[in-house]
Amino acid sequence: MQEMNQHLAQRLKGLRSELGWSLDVAARETGVSKAMLGQIERGESSPTVATLWKIATGFRVSFSSFIEPAQAVQGEVLYRAADAIRQQPAGEGMQVAPLFPYEKRFGFELFELTLLPGYQRESEPHEPGVTEHVIVISGLMEVLVEGEWRSLVQGEAVRFAADRPHGYRNLGIAPAIFHNLIHYPAARSRE
């Protein structure tokens, strides 16, 4: 977790510097308080997944860019093991493994997400044109799409426009594991 906080602090400082944004401007663009952004930059706070999404959306960068440093790709083959990279931001009931972090040439990022029993997260809309693809690997979960919760079980999938409110929850007694492919529109301003 400490490594993630250090990376997050460096990434946030770097983006602000690159754009010439003050903490006030960053707070306005992300919807995250100036105090919280300052704590994150100093490595004093472990933000929730929801807060990380707000920051990524405000800066118009991928979510995975805040989870781990960009990987230097050696050739066209990239092997990843979810168990080796799984993290649980801010002690939430969701574990995140960025299987394929965002690369501009592909336009997407792929996560393995684990929802612990009882966990629920409703997400604010991402930037216009973002699409999510959810594929359940094991367990039972529900997805909030177009204002309605829909159950999904192992082997089922849904694709939806993520530039609208949406969410995920696990009302069961066992973890629910799914892949989430997030596709970004071609005209992204930064990355």
Q: What are these model-derived regions, one by one?
A:
Residues 50-65:
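DNA major-groove recognition helix of helix-turn-helix/homeodomain DNA-binding modules
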Residues 123, 143-144, 150-152, 166-172:
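Short beta-strand His + acidic residue motifs that chelate non-heme Fe in jelly-roll/DSBH
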Residues 20-35:
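Short alpha-helical DNA-recognition segment
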Residues 129-146:
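Glycine- and acidic-residue-biased ligand/ion/polar-headgroup-sensing regions
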Residues 1-18:
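A short, Lys/Arg-rich alpha-helix, primarily the initiator
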Residues 94-95, 106, 154, 162-188:
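Ligand-binding loop in jelly-roll beta-barrel domains
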Residues 81, 85-124, 180-185:
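A short glycine-rich, His/Asp/Glu-containing loop-to-beta-strand
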Residues 147-161:
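Short acidic-glycine-tyrosine-enriched beta hairpin
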